[in-house]
């Protein structure tokens, strides 16, 4: 049966947004669980860190009050990127019922998933590729993975304005020793005033490698210490899991979404939604009304989204690139 533009338009009015939003929900979510996401209206924004971490000083009777000043840290600049997708319904598909209204709505649902997948791919590659300086994305663009300090997002030599270095990178397998090593990375972090950073991680993030997933779940939900032959008390799990977990679909991915086996056991600790891993969105994925090509009579249905992301300071996350 011939599918007219009018019929397609009516179907879109009733169902397209629902299908598109359902498609967005079907996409991965690991990156959005970690990054601090906010909406913006400007193409370019600047985010500075300020460290005001003073300690009151002893002052004698009638003495001058101690004075402290904030220390300005590093600046992270966001520039909005545009990402698009579309699909075409040809006149023949409509005319010979090869592409029904339901099929068209499935395509619109796929567009919703497409935008969500690209957002997640970029966010998660920002972590999975974060031990390097940059990578080339599927469009051939060079994407920086440097933090605002000019060092790799995850590095053994992250810098501060106080001139003191700290680390948020350690290659060690998941387990009791690994958790303690990464907790110590947090304990040793310093801010731009040179004082300790008071950040407690909330989540373990990791790839979907079954052996790693199962080890983490077993470790966090066992009353006994699964790494000890004597089965001592598991301090991370006997009162209930100390950390929540986030499975990241693209943590071990290449920029073209293929699997990178060298990153199969990547994991780390993170303060989810902390201020240092940032994502700014100026336009969430949207679907536009179909456009008819006057020369071909084909219908083109399009979507786009605009966002940027980056790492300011390295205080919120660690990475084990074992």
Predicted regions and their residues:
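N-terminal alpha-helical "arm" segments
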Residues: 1-26
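Sequence/fold signature of self-assembling virion shell proteins
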Residues: 2-6, 144-191, 199-203, 209-322
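Assembly/oligomerization interface modules of large self-assembling protein complexes
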Residues: 21-83
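Catalytic micro-motifs at enzyme active sites that drive phosphoryl/nucleotidyl and oxygen chemistry
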Residues: 70-77, 98, 191-194
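Long, contiguous amphipathic alpha-helices that act as assembly "spine/axial" helices in icosahedral shell
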Residues: 75-135, 204, 299-303
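Short, flexible turn/loop "capping" segments at secondary-structure junctions
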Residues: 80-81, 196-198
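Structural motif corresponding to the C-terminal cap of alpha-helices
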Residues: 91, 95, 186-193
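Extracytoplasmic/periplasmic solute-binding protein
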Residues: 132-147
